[in-house]
């Protein structure tokens, strides 16, 4: 139950860095950046005596702040022979950060980024100082370009299709009719071949799904291999026992569920983030729990492990004690607040919305307005609601909002939704 607060990359990354929702850190959409003057947990780590570094995907437009060392992709970066911008190369440069001349590294970006992370630990890490390193891969971002050595992986395998891949969206909110993130919206760059003609919607979905998933999983294989390289380095250099290792992403992703790819909406495939943490000194291997965690909790949790107090500007909470003994601190949340701001984005035609998620229910309000945020576009929309009951409908295909049996559930969830919206000081 680890949930993203805004399921799109730059806003989620800003939330992870700051422990704040988008309306507090200023990164509402992909067109916003995290100002170097803004507080973030890397700065707190530095104040606490930690050496800090970030390598790979940054994607927050401005120069990374709070890092003693960085070597990052400009913007989204590229898969093959990526360019990385280092702190040294940025010195004295006044152009927009992503336009900074960087260095070309030969190879696939996943391999390059892992190698640079290992190299930093070998060459730059101060053995007399604790460290915090962020290693951020580009993969498996669209358009899923994998390293050549994985080209035959799953070649003759048919990937099982999700049960709801042919969702008809009956009874659902109107956004399902507007979105252009269905498998049939994939283009030749995504598929890396000419698209077949004269296929029905479902026939195209079946064809596209197999190509999409194999490319995606080949990208994942590269990540798996390179995470292994990093873990091996930590083991071989006596660092594993006393290092907190966090494996996560900036959001979830639709892998054919509802016939979709991408993210942005509140169904579990998009809302839920992978989160695995290894810390042999304190976390029991193989342990799991169902506590509701949000990505705003990452920063205060990491500070907690570093022995640094949570600053007042952070909206998340440390979940260290949950990892240690499985017990939630008194007053731990029983619901999470979500908000997606990028209305009418030109590639996916998604609708702005906010909502609440509990262990059983999701209530979502699609308000459908730009609110003058960067990267939004006017797209007429009549506001509507969805209610999912994940106990009765775990695949989130039925909208129970207008079902009379759920009137009290809706009323209670609306009250809780607006309580959370107010508590987080989201006033728009």
Which residues does each PLM region occupy?
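Residues forming the ATP-binding cleft of Hanks-type serine/threonine protein kinase domains
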Residues: 391
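Formylglycine-dependent sulfatase
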Residues: 1-385, 394-428
């Amino acid at each position: 139950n680890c949930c993203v607060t805004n399921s799109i990359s730059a806003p989620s990354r800003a939330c992870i860095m700051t422990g704040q929702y988008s309306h507090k850190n200023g990164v509402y959409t992909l067109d916003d950046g995290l100002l170097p003057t803004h507080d973030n947990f890397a700065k707190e780590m530095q104040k606490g005596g930690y050496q800090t570094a970030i390598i790979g995907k940054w994607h927050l437009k401005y120069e990374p702040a709070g890092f003693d060392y960085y070597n990052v992709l400009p913007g989204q970066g590229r898969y093959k022979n990526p360019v990385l911008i280092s702190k040294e190369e940025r010195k004295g440069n006044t152009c927009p950060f992503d336009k900074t001349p960087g260095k070309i590294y030969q190879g696939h970006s996943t391999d390059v980024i892992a190698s640079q992370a290992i190299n930093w630990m070998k060459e730059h890490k101060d053995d007399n100082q604790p460290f915090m390193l962020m290693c951020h891969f580009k993969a498996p971002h669209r358009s899923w370009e994998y390293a050549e050595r994985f080209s035959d992986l799953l070649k003759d395998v048919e990937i099982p299709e999700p049960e709801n891949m042919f969702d008809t969206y009956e009874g659902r909110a109107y956004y399902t009719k507007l979105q252009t993130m269905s498998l049939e919206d994939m283009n030749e760059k995504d598929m890396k071949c000419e698209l077949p003609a004269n296929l029905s919607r479902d026939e195209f979905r079946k064809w596209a799904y197999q190509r999409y998933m194999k490319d995606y999983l080949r990208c994942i294989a590269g990540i798996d291999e390179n995470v292994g390289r990093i873990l091996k380095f930590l083991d071989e250099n006596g660092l594993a026992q006393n290092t907190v290792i966090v494996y996560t992403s900036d959001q979830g992703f639709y892998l054919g569920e509802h016939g979709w790819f991408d993210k942005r909406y509140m169904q579990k495939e998009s809302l839920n983030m992978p989160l695995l943490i290894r810390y042999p000194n304190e976390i029991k291997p193989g342990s799991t729990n169902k506590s509701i965690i949000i990505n705003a909790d990452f920063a205060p949790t990491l500070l907690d492990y570093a022995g640094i107090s949570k600053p007042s500007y952070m909206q998340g909470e440390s979940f260290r004690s949950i990892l240690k003994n499985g017990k939630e601190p008194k007053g731990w949340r029983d619901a999470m607040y979500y908000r997606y701001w990028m209305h009418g984005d030109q590639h996916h035609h998604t609708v702005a919305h906010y909502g609440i998620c509990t262990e059983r229910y999701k209530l979502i309000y699609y308000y459908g307005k730009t609110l003058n945020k960067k990267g939004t576009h006017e797209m007429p929309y009549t506001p509507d609601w969805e209610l999912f009951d994940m106990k009765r409908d775990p695949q989130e295909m039925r909208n129970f909002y207008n079902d009379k049996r759920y009137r009290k559930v809706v009323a209670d969830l609306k009250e809780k939704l607006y309580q959370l919206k107010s508590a987080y000081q989201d006033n728009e």
